[in-house]
Amino acid sequence: MIQQESRLKVADNTGAKEILTIRVLGGSGRRYAGIGDVIVATVKDAIPGGNVKKGDVVKAVIVRTKKERRRADGSYIKFDENAAVILKNDGDPRGTRIFGPVGRELRDKKFMKIVSLAPEVL
């Protein structure tokens, strides 16, 4: 469960290392975001010479959460960290590589480019 002020690891090669959630998109009173939800965030930590720099406001999709999520078949999925992938305005990932596994929920939410770049889909 990601909400305002949540800090997430960045799971791509855009140059950002950590982002801070500004807003959860998808309704005026929406408080929490899970795997496959889009957020607006600011870059808090970045490497020099990267695609994004500290202070940039970006859109990102959540790919891993520590909070368990119940699936339709009754199973639960949770990860060791909260992580996101930075997006372009058209919804495609800004980076060219994805690090670590991503949730299967991304396939249902039509983030096929991220699913194809990911090394593992759980």
From Swiss-Prot:
Alphabetized CDD domains for the sequence: Ribosomal_uL14
Keywords of the record: Ribonucleoprotein, Ribosomal protein, RNA-binding, rRNA-binding
A Pfam family the protein falls into: Ribosomal_L14
Superkingdom assignment: Bacteria
Similarity comment: family membership: Belongs to the universal ribosomal protein uL14 family.
PANTHER family: 50S/60S RIBOSOMAL PROTEIN L14/L23, LARGE RIBOSOMAL SUBUNIT PROTEIN UL14M
Cited function: Binds to 23S rRNA. Forms part of two intersubunit bridges in the 70S ribosome.
Name by which UniProt lists this protein: Large ribosomal subunit protein uL14
UniProt organism field: Arthrobacter sp. (strain FB24)
